Regions:
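A general structural motif
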Residues: 1-3, 44, 94, 123-124
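Conserved N-terminal catalytic core of the sugar/cofactor nucleotidyltransferase
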Residues: 33-96, 162
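Catalytic-core segments of class I nucleotidyltransferases/pyrophosphorylases
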Residues: 131-162
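N-terminal glycine-rich phosphate-binding loop and ensuing alpha1 helix
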Residues: 2-51, 56-58
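Residues at secondary-structure transition points
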Residues: 18-21, 26-30, 49, 53, ...
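Hydrophobic packing residues within well-ordered alpha-helices of enzyme cores
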Residues: 17, 58-62, 115, 149
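Conserved beta-loop-beta/alpha segment of the NTase-like Rossmann-fold superfamily
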Residues: 76-143
Length: 162
């Protein structure tokens, strides 16, 4: 059965703040939990959280949430390595995947649903929301682009597909 998946990127080292941003409090929970809650309250059917540098800490926080997780052994190679880890985790028959940064709790379920609707109505394989002439999140990638994602060089980003 084809499904819409979310890939939540939570493998980074959080060096800039000195403390993992995803574990900071936000609206009565942590930032990563708010991201998960927003995804769960959307039309997304399955979710995988990509873990890395602080996997033990994040796993403790998200343990009771109905999400799957995978571990990116090469998280130091950057965000694209985490995206690829998430895509490797997806079943072969998924319909599309939305890529979410694990530290952006303000991506509402409504925004996610609009991206999914645009995908289904347009027939396009890649959908990226734009706000104020700036590209945003979540980026939706159809299963037909799975191989292209897996072949991207580390220096390239997903935006090269869009």
């Amino acid at each position: 059965m084809s499904e819409i998946w979310a890939i939540i990127l939570a493998a980074g080292e959080s060096k800039r703040m000195g403390f993992p941003k995803m574990l900071l409090p936000f609206r009565g929970m942590t930032i990563i939990e708010q991201v998960i809650e927003n995804v769960i309250n959307s039309q997304v059917e399955e979710t995988v959280v990509v873990l890395g540098a602080i996997s033990d800490e994040i796993r403790k926080v998200i343990g009771n949430w109905p999400v799957k997780h995978c571990y990116n052994e090469v998280y130091k190679e950057g965000m694209l390595s985490s995206v690829k880890c998430g895509f490797r985790f997806l079943p072969h028959d998924f319909e599309a995947a939305l890529v979410f940064p694990g530290d952006q709790p303000l991506i509402s379920p409504e925004i996610t649903d609009k991206v999914i609707s645009a995908f289904r109505l347009s027939g396009k394989g890649i959908i990226m929301p734009v706000y104020g002439n700036k590209r945003g999140h979540p980026l939706l990638i159809s299963s037909r682009y799975r191989e292209e994602v897996m072949l991207l060089d580390p220096g390239e980003g997903l935006r090269t597909l869009a």
